[in-house]
């Protein structure tokens, strides 16, 4: 059974990143952080996280581009991606999902709802891997 609950948080706003990191660590998760998609891509190539929480508007590489790159790479397409963004129009949400995000949550978000969503995807990922190993 997988016990590695490593999350990658990709967020360029330090306050938002630290708040979310604290909440995820309180739930028992290890959290790695990147401030842009380019650095996040390097991190994913080094050690695959169980789940990615991703902002959209970031320097160097935006969240949509990062999401597309991961979901079209067979090594990483299984990693759940939850976009958390201040871009709240229906077209923004549709674009995020079309890029391969598993969820699109608008800011400001309810922290309990976000942590519940993270838990749902982590639980699903662990069950899929465990059933594949049987």
At which residue positions do the language-model features occur?
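Conserved acidic carboxylate
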Residues: 11
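Charged docking surfaces used in two-component/phosphorelay signaling
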Residues: 18-26
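Acidic, metal-coordinating helix/loop segments flanking the phosphotransfer/catalytic sites
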Residues: 33-51
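Receiver (REC) domain active-site loop signature in two-component systems and cognate sites
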Residues: 58
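C-terminal output helix
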Residues: 109-119
């Amino acid at each position: 059974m997988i016990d590695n609950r490593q999350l990658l948080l990709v967020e360029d706003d330090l306050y938002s990143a630290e708040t979310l990191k604290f909440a995820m660590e309180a739930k028992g998760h290890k959290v790695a952080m990147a401030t842009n998609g380019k650095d996040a891509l390097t991190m994913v190539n080094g050690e695959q996280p169980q789940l990615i929480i991703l902002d959209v508007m970031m320097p160097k590489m935006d969240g949509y581009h990062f999401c597309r790159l991961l979901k079209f790479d067979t090594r990483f397409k299984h990693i759940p991606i939850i976009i958390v963004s201040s871009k709240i129009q229906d077209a923004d949400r549709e674009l995020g999902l079309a890029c391969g995000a598993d969820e699109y949550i608008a800011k400001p978000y309810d922290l309990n709802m976000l942590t519940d969503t993270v838990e749902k995807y982590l639980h699903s990922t662990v069950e899929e891997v465990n059933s594949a190993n049987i």
